[in-house]
């Protein structure tokens, strides 16, 4: 018997509520003009990678647990002597999420992880790049429920980039606000 796949909450909300709201607010002529979240890139840069080359693979395992997708170990493109970095040396890990996994991750980020961040006052509404993409940083990866706090030997930060099809920052801001992203006012 085939198992029925469940649609992520945020995806359902996007197609049933958010699209109509954005259509009314920005008066799009075509349904394809309505902005949507294209992909989410989660990156961990490990500063101690020059000392211990096993750290990026440990970070990749944690990132895989957080996102539900296998992480890729990122390597140095060229050597930088002042940072003791050689070309090809592992420096971190990254994951690119699309479709259902992306919506599931955004749901966990907004509802569980961000409220657990220490001294959280909201996301900076100026962190858009001018083309509708939003970037944010989290200082501790242990805010995600998938990480067992007792088994963690090192706490790493991570960068989360939300890429949208929005043409302007205002459109992207409204899209993410509709997804309940807690922006500072």
From Swiss-Prot:
Keyword Ribonucleoprotein: yes
GO CC aspect terms: ribonucleoprotein complex; ribosome
Coiled coil: none
GO biological process: translation
Gene3D superfamilies, per database record: 3.30.1440.10
Keywords: Ribonucleoprotein, Ribosomal protein, RNA-binding, rRNA-binding, tRNA-binding
Keyword tRNA-binding belongs to the record: yes
Similarity remark: Belongs to the universal ribosomal protein uL5 family.
Role according to the record: This is one of the proteins that bind and probably mediate the attachment of the 5S RNA into the large ribosomal subunit, where it forms part of the central protuberance. In the 70S ribosome it contacts protein S13 of the 30S subunit (bridge B1b), connecting the 2 subunits; this bridge is implicated in subunit movement. Contacts the P site tRNA; the 5S rRNA and some of its associated proteins might help stabilize positioning of ribosome-bound tRNAs.
Alphabetical list of HAMAP family matching this protein: Ribosomal_uL5_B (MF_01333_B)
Subunit structure: Part of the 50S ribosomal subunit; part of the 5S rRNA/L5/L18/L25 subcomplex. Contacts the 5S rRNA and the P site tRNA. Forms a bridge to the 30S subunit in the 70S ribosome.
UniProt protein name: Large ribosomal subunit protein uL5
Organism per entry: Bartonella quintana (strain Toulouse) (Rochalimaea quintana)
Gene that encodes it: rplE
